[in-house]
Amino acid sequence: MNWRSERIWIELITGSRKTSNFCWACILFLGSLGFLLVGTSSYLGKNLISLLPSQQILFFPQGIVMSFYGIAGLFISSYLWCTISWNVGSGYDRFDRKEGIVCIFRWGFPGINRRIFLRFLMRDIQSIRMEVKEGLYSRRVLYMEIRGQGAIPLTRTDDNLTPREIEQKAAELAYFLRVPIELK
């Protein structure tokens, strides 16, 4: 959801609470739990999972490896669930022509830098830069060039915007900010 008037443009950024992250977290949790149960059942010699008899899997080396993969998968799954619950990466971009200020806010991981808040003067914005890489792993990212600060990404690398969408977004933002567009 975005909001725009003549003087203010607010763009909300979705963070890690995306459908793909929920799917990967569920798949990883269930798969690693299955691996851990198979490894544990081979150690105990009892069938904890009725689909697979534990006598067919020896604890050394298959059971140990499956238990290791199960534990590693549970750690990665818990990391994904934590990023989803903390909504890491979400926030907003606010461009205020009336005040002449650009504010970029993102939520980070818990700790000292949980809230990432950047503020710039509009007169310090040099350009809007589009970076387009085509090929097997195509990537289209929009950057804001700040004098003395470098480039700040405005879109995520996994947004998968079409060339037309990224061009339109860059043109609208450059027109709103009254800065040129660079293509890299």
Swiss-Prot record:
Assigned protein family: Belongs to the Ycf4 family.
Subcellular locations according to the entry: Plastid, Chloroplast thylakoid membrane
InterPro entries cross-referenced by the UniProt entry: PSI_Ycf4_assembly
Gene source species: Chloranthus spicatus
Gene: ycf4
UniProt topology in membrane: Multi-pass membrane protein
A single BP term in Gene Ontology: photosynthesis
Entries under HAMAP family matching the protein: Ycf4
Keywords: Chloroplast, Membrane, Photosynthesis, Plastid, Thylakoid, Transmembrane, Transmembrane helix
Signal peptide limits: none
Known function: Seems to be required for the assembly of the photosystem I complex.
Transmembrane stretches, start-end: 22-42, 57-77
Protein name in the entry: Photosystem I assembly protein Ycf4
Any single Gene Ontology cellular-component annotation: chloroplast thylakoid membrane
Predominant place of localization: plastid
PANTHER family per UniProt: PHOTOSYSTEM I ASSEMBLY PROTEIN YCF4, PTHR33288
Keyword Lyase annotated: no
Coiled-coil region: none
